[in-house]
Amino acid sequence: MDRWIAATHGAELRRSTDPVAVDLGYGAAPWTPVELLTRLRTAAPRTRVVGVEIDPARVAAARPYEREGLAFRHGGFEVPVQGSPSLIRAANVLRQYDEEQVADVWQRLCARLAPAGPGSRGGLLVEGTCDEIGRRHVWVALGPEGPRTVTFATRL
């Protein structure tokens, strides 16, 4: 998922004056925000990543991993970052919600994204799920205007 984001959204991140990516619901350990920062900085070196987690204990445990370009915040779908992020990634988060709730959450998250402008399609929400070891993935990419793509990926 991260490689796809860097490849398809890297130019948009480079164009942004303050490229912020949010890893929403990173889980028990902070590895996914750390990996996201590494991947995105190959495409857009000024990108900052904010890991957002609903569990305060997980945020506290992640704080020792903070460094230039990487921060952790307590929160949820309100996305507690200043401004409008260029990217929100929510992996394995919405699969625990009822299907009827997903469209409202997508709309809420897309409302937080950077708006489209001259030469810009605006921010990107990438929401999806994978198996336990990350070999099979599916995700949808949405912008402020609505769905853009759906991707199925597998590693054999």
Regions found by a protein language model. Give the residues of each.
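Local beta-strand N-terminus motif with an aromatic residue
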Residues: 18, 84-86, 90, 122
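A short glycine-rich, Lys/Arg-flanked "PGG" loop and its adjoining helix->strand segment in the class I
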Residues: 95, 103-123
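Class I (Rossmann-like) S-adenosyl-L-methionine-dependent methyltransferase catalytic domain
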Residues: 1-24, 28-67, 74-79, 118-156
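Short, surface-exposed, charge-dense and proline/glycine-enriched linear segments
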Residues: 101, 105, 153-156
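A short SAM/SAH-binding and catalytic strip from SAM-dependent methyltransferases
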Residues: 85-103
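Hydrophobic/aromatic-lined pockets within catalytic cores
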Residues: 41, 98, 114
